[in-house]
Amino acid sequence: MAIYGIGTDVVQISRIAAVLERTGGRFAEKVLGPDELRVFHARRARSEARGIAFLATRFSAKEAFSKAIGLGMHWPMTWRALQTLNQRSGEPYVVASGELADWLAARGITARVTVSDERDYAVSFVVTETDAAPPPAPAPVSRTTS
């Protein structure tokens, strides 16, 4: 396996809370995939703060993943196409769907993710790996004078 890319993201949890309040909850529906949304609602029902922290970590993971694959938030990377779920052990993992899953499979890309949150911030780190041969290095830029 070779490293394809890395990405990290830090988000202020209060910013996520403000956007969630301003949008009446639509922000969570825009950003979270269906499995993430179920977990968000369950956690938020038990504790508003834990629900918002969950949303913040998932938002951060999507941002970090988009950086690790080198696309940013551009097709085929969309908010709902990538979900960060947890194993029974608590270990997070990512699941891609739709065109993003196809794009990743075509390049042999897999990912490892970690997320964490504290009172004020959520952070995530993603490493993407591939079995495929790396793309050729870009040609050096040369300057010509006339």
UniProtKB/Swiss-Prot annotation:
> Which GO CC terms are listed, alphabetically?
cytoplasm
Tell me where it resides: Cytoplasm
Gene Ontology MF terms: holo-[acyl-carrier-protein] synthase activity; magnesium ion binding
> Which HAMAP family does the annotation name?
AcpS
Instruction: Tell whether Transport is among the UniProt keywords.
Output: no
Family the entry assigns: Belongs to the P-Pant transferase superfamily. AcpS family.
The entry's function note states: Transfers the 4'-phosphopantetheine moiety from coenzyme A to a Ser of acyl-carrier-protein.
Q: Give the residue range of the signal peptide.
A: none
**Any idea what this protein is called?**
Holo-[acyl-carrier-protein] synthase
Q: Does the keyword Metal-binding apply?
A: yes
Upper lineage: Bacteria, Pseudomonadati, Pseudomonadota, Betaproteobacteria, Burkholderiales
**Required co-factors:** Mg(2+)
List keywords of the entry alphabetically. Answer: Cytoplasm, Fatty acid biosynthesis, Fatty acid metabolism, Lipid biosynthesis, Lipid metabolism, Magnesium, Metal-binding, Transferase
Provide the binding site for Mg(2+). 9, 63
Q: Which InterPro entries does the UniProt record give?
A: 4-PPantetheinyl_Trfase_dom, 4-PPantetheinyl_Trfase_dom_sf, ACPS, Ppantetheine-prot_Trfase_dom
Task: Please state the protein's primary subcellular location.
Answer: cytoplasm
